[in-house]
Amino acid sequence: MKKVKKPLVFLTGLALCAALSLPQAESARAAATGSDPALAAALETLLRERPEIILDVLRQNSEAVLDIAQQGSNLRRKHNLEVQWRKDMENPKSVQLENRPVLGRPDARVRIVAFSDFTCHFCEQASKNVEALRKTYGDDICLIFKHLPLDEKGPGGIASSYFVAIAQQDEDKAWKFYDLMFSNRDRLLAEGEPFIKESAQNLGVDMKRLSRDVRSKKVSDILAEDQKDAQKLGVEGTPYFLVNDLVVRGALPLDLFRDAVEMARDGKKGAKP
């Protein structure tokens, strides 16, 4: 018997799974996997003679077919990430954490180190996911924010300098400033430093000290260390996270980010200072 063309039969099975009742769908799956050679051969012959059949089925069930394809894509992405993360766990990362404010318990089982930019849309999205994770895992998670603005002299870079400087006075106020920058990203982009100063003043920051600290060598050294850490890790864009030693690139969907936290929590301690 001639070997059945797998892509053709698989597409047939996909369409039939979307369109038919469960017993029929099981037969389609049997054909797609080759467990029923006679049925597979019959389907191949039919579709070669009447290819419009499968096109009609796909059109009539386009949403179901897309859902099936998306589920497969999501499973593949999850698998690829888990493979990467298992490798990451065997490759400890070292970054500078001294003099950085910590949101949460410093001895938390999972330390999330974020390389981010206050003006980045995807960073804003990712910050919401991190907050959701902190609510879910509580004291098991802490966050450290490292600065990687696209434009060091633009609003993102200026906001980074202010965050570090405010943290020298009061770490709680620095994290409130962090929230204000991300939640008002449009104003940050449009108004720049005047909005940044207004936000700091509204938080009750000592503005005279802030004006000195923001231009101090201590602040510039911390920001320079963040840049060096990013280069050492090969960070190519923001957001970028170390979840202990696991690397998370981009604004990963919350469910996948949660998978990284679960794996890190059950694995090794990471990201040594």
Which residues does each PLM region occupy?
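Surface-exposed patches in mature extracellular/periplasmic domains of secreted proteins
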Residues: L55-L58, A174-Y178, R209-D213, K272
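Bacterial N-terminal signal peptides
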Residues: L11-S21
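Short acidic/histidine-centered micro-motifs embedded in hydrophobic/aromatic stretches
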Residues: Q60, L180-N184, D213, K217
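Bacterial Sec-dependent N-terminal signal peptides
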Residues: M1-L11
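Structural alpha/beta surface segment adjacent to cysteine/selenocysteine redox centers
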Residues: V113, E124-Q201, Q231-E236
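Stable alpha-helical elements in mature extracytoplasmic
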Residues: L39-A42, R50, I54, A126-N129, ...
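Extracytoplasmic thiol/disulfide redox context detector
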Residues: A19, S27-G154, D221-K232, D266-P273
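C-terminal cap of thioredoxin/glutaredoxin-like
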Residues: K2, G34-L46, A64, I68-A69, ...
